[in-house]
């Protein structure tokens, strides 16, 4: 199902497959490292591999999205449809697109994943062995995601050539404008009076939830 969602978004079997494959590699490496460290999967952390898979897919999607922007438009997907279509002539080859994607996402990706590692590692202060093992499992998994999504995936993308590039580019342009009316309608809420109404409604909901939360 995850692969299907990625395919519908990227319109590419190759990009969807590479993202899922790198996420699975992160999970397999995590299980192998845990075995080497003398740990295993118990009922407490049996869902951790799925969590690591989801995190890896999320960061992998960012990489393929930037890669696709480079091979379609030669940069970020910013500007009007006509501007993006005109930038199609600046599209780069897969090798250069992978290099640019790696350079742009390496630092923010590492910072984000290291923050996740620190967050999971902080759970180890709880003096319960099963909880500490859960923290170790998640920390190792997120750390390995740095290698799979920020190093392995760009290398694989550098060898990836997409077919029907012009058709995929036009489809992406339609994707970018598909929800313009929805965003235009929601942008009304950014005005002072509608924004104040939203804040007031949120305050009422918070107070209601706080009152009933004490009874749980």
Task: Spell out what each predicted region is.
Residues 1-216:
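Membrane-embedded transmembrane helical bundles of large multi-pass transporters/channels
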């Amino acid at each position: 199902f995850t692969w299907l969602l990625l395919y519908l978004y990227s319109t590419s079997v190759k990009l969807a497959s590479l993202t899922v494959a790198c996420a699975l590699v992160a999970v397999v490496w995590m299980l192998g490292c845990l075995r080497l460290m003398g740990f295993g999967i118990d009922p407490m952390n049996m869902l951790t591999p799925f969590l690591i898979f989801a995190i890896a897919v999320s960061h992998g999607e960012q990489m393929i999205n930037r890669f696709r922007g480079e091979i379609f438009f030669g940069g970020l997907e910013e500007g009007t449809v006509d501007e993006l279509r005109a930038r199609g002539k600046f599209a780069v080859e897969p090798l250069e697109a992978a290099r640019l994607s790696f350079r742009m996402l390496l630092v923010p990706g590492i910072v984000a994943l290291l923050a996740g590692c620190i967050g999971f590692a902080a759970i180890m202060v709880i003096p319960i062995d099963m909880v500490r093992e859960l923290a170790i499992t998640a920390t190792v998994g997120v750390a390995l995601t740095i290698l799979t999504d920020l190093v392995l995936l760009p290398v694989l993308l550098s060898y990836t050539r997409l077919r029907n590039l012009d058709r995929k580019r036009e489809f992406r342009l339609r994707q970018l404008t598909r929800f313009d009316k929805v965003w235009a309608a929601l942008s009304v809420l950014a005005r002072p009076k509608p924004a104040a109404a939203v804040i007031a409604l949120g305050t009422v909901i918070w107070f209601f939830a706080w009152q009933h939360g004490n009874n749980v």
